Amino acid sequence: MQFDWSAIWPAIPLLIEGAKMTLWISVLGLAGGLVIGLLAGFARTFGGWIANHVALVFIEVIRGTPIVVQVMFIYFALPMAFNDLRIDPFTAAVVTIMINSGAYIAEITRGAVLSIHKGFREAGLALGLSRWETIRYVILPLALRRMLPPLGNQWIISIKDTSLFIVIGVAELTRQGQEIIAGNFRALEIWSAVAVFYLIITLVLSFILRRLERRMKIL
C-alpha cells in the first residue's frame, strides 16, 4: 500500500481535538493522583499501623490490576452496583487516572521522603518545630524536588495510558484516530499521524521537565 499524505491533512483538526482531550484527562487525573499519592505516601511513611496498612492495600490492589480493568470497573460495574450512580466516560477516565497514578505516586513519595537524610528531621526538631511542622516545612520541600523526575515520568505514562480509554468511548487521541479510519479506511496514514502526535506531546513534556529539573537544582 502506498502512503497517501493527502489522507492526513483533513484528519489533523480532529486529531488536535483528541490530543487536547488526552492532555486534559492526564492533567486533571495527575492533579488528583498527586493528592492521593501524597496522602497514601505519607500514610505509608509516617502513619500508624491502620493508616499504613490501608494505604498498602490500596497501593497493591491498584498496582496489581490493569488500568483497563480499573476503568471498566468504574464505568460499567459501579453503576450496576449503585443504581442511582451515573458516570460519563470523561469522568470515568479522569477518576481512573487519579486512582492509578495515585498508587504509583504514593511509592514515589515514600521513596523521596525516605531518601532525605535524617539529619534534616533532627535539625527541624532541634529548632523547636513539631513533628508535622518539620515534615511540612523541611522534609516535604526537599522531597518534592526529588520527586520531580519520577512525577514527570508518571505524567508521560498517564498520557499514554489514556489511549486505553478507547474501550469506554472517550474522544481522546486514539479514539479520534479510530473514528477517522472508520470513515476513510487509511489505517497506515492515520495511525502514523496518531503516533507522531503522541511523540510530539511526550518529547515536549520531557524537554520542559528537564528544564525544570535544572532550574530547581535537584538535591
UniProtKB/Swiss-Prot annotation:
Q: Gene3D superfamilies under this entry?
A: MetI-like
Which stretches make up the ABC transmembrane type-1 domain? 19-209
| Residue intervals annotated with topology Periplasmic | 1-22, 75-88, 172-187
| Disulfide bridge positions per record | none
Q: Which family does the record claim for this protein?
A: Belongs to the binding-protein-dependent transport system permease family. HisMQ subfamily.
Function in brief: Part of the binding-protein-dependent transport system for glutamine; probably responsible for the translocation of the substrate across the membrane.
Please identify the protein, giving its name as recorded.
Glutamine transport system permease protein GlnP
**Gene source species:** Escherichia coli (strain K12)
